[in-house]
């Protein structure tokens, strides 16, 4: 992933532009809000982020109905996306998209759009997309529930993940051996201070329908938080090592004491031994294919 730098500048609204450059600027007038089959491009999304920065922050509500709030980890994991319902399945495109269900600690629904020929249309949640396993919901789940996020699959093996966008502003990717690297966040705010850190959230995504010859998937995202808003553009290029090229415009709503751009995160079990991050350890028989991976 490419990281940018922050250059100090005057103004109450700080605008950070990643991909080897950054600047601070005041918010500008934005285009009208998104609607069904509305024209979409990068400039429009940046305008949305600027307009949101001019408005008071509205905390995100609880999108999980009680039935999903009560799920255990095993019950939630029993909810599986049906691959035959993937976005772009049955086409000659190199990518497919599968969606994640709300539940357990995924409490905020994200809006996901497909962009085709510059027109954005929202992808509707449909319970038929999912196999709920032994789970039975009474009353039935709402028909407009929404998604928790999505994962990207590539034509070399549609069964394997390439990248995942799910939870707050988290995203991550795999290599050709399906080993996930460290997770990344779109933005970190006030980490390591005496007060709790702030977690800005990707609330909307736009997936650009690729051409049959495309081997890079373009994903856009809108970030919302109490202290900042942002517009993000991801170029996801699968391969031996998956490469993500990221452009981001981040606008501060108020002064931020500590800001982290493209922060990397991992985890390890605390104990007497030296910490071994779960994102970088693999176990295999040598040069032959991997047989197992230590995750946690």
Language model regions located:
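C-terminal segment of N-terminal export signals and the immediately downstream linker at the start
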Residues: 17-58
């Amino acid at each position: 992933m490419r990281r940018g730098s922050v250059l100090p500048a005057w103004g109450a609204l700080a605008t950070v532009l990643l991909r080897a450059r950054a600047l601070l600027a005041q918010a500008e007038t934005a285009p009208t809000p998104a609607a069904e089959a509305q024209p979409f491009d990068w400039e429009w999304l940046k305008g949305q982020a600027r307009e949101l920065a001019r408005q008071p922050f509205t905390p995100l509500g609880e999108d999980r109905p009680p039935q999903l709030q009560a799920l255990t980890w095993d019950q939630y994991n029993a909810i599986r996306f049906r691959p035959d319902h993937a976005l772009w399945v049955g086409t000659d495109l190199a990518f497919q998209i599968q969606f994640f269900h709300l539940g357990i600690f995924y409490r905020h629904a994200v809006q996901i759009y497909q962009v085709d020929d510059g027109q954005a249309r929202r992808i509707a949640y449909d319970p038929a997309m999912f196999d709920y396993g032994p789970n039975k919901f009474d009353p039935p789940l709402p028909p407009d529930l929404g998604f928790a996020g999505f994962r990207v699959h590539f034509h070399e093996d549609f069964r394997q993940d390439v990248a995942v966008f799910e939870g707050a502003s988290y995203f991550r990717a795999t290599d050709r051996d399906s080993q996930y690297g460290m997770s990344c966040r779109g933005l970190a705010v006030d980490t390591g201070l005496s007060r709790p850190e702030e977690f800005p959230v990707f609330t909307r995504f736009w997936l650009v329908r690729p051409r049959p010859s495309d081997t890079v998937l373009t994903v856009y995202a809108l970030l919302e938080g109490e202290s900042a808003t942002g517009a993000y553009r991801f170029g996801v290029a699968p391969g031996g090592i998956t490469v993500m090229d990221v452009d981001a415009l981040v606008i501060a709503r108020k002064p931020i004491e500590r800001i982290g751009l493209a922060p990397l995160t991992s985890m390890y079990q605390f104990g007497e031994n030296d910490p071994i991050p779960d994102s970088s350890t693999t176990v295999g028989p040598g040069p032959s294919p991997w047989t197992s991976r230590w995750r946690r």
